[in-house]
Amino acid sequence: LVDWLYNKGVTKFDDMTNLSKDVRQQLTDNFTILDLNVVGEVKTESEDTVKFLFSLPDGRRIESVLMWEGKRRTLCVSSQVGCPLDCHFCATGKMGLIRNLSAAEIVDQVLYGQRFLRQRGEELTNVVMMGMGEPLLNFDQVLRAIRLMNLDFGAAIGIRRITLSTAGHVPGIKRLSEEKLKIGLAVS
């Protein structure tokens, strides 16, 4: 399953041809692949950035932003719907916190970005946790998502190619340091 989901990028269980028809039907009846529904896609005039607007199963919406810079393909992913902080430079805080994203909803953004790029013959090189929300206020799910992104048999994003951007939540930074992950940390 992992190979089909992460490496081959299938979006339907029926495409997993090495599984029996009965198993594929059971999977289809009980699970979904990529719960994000793309409801918008906006490219900049220079075409070096594209913003994806996703609808979640509960109807809430989140954004991810894909950026091209030289050989780098960086995806900025959301960790919350809204945000409890009210940073002056960020519109998301005006929404307030609606809810935290699950690790699966965070990783789904990465899988979508990988599929989007692979259709163009490109690969995702970097992930930054700096979309909607304060990642350190959704610590457990963000940490789980980072570990899933980094699995060799998963999304296979190198740990040093993952950056967490925070508004400076000190207790979260301290807790993150205890995890001994070698991700990047950006404070904005």
Predicted regions and their residues:
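Flexible, acidic/Gly-rich N-terminal and inter-domain linker regions that tether
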Residues: 2-73
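Residue-level signal for secondary-structure boundary elements
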Residues: 13, 35, 118, 184-185
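Conserved Radical SAM active-site core
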Residues: 62-183
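Extended basic-aromatic, gly/pro-enriched interface segments that bind polyanionic ligands
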Residues: 188
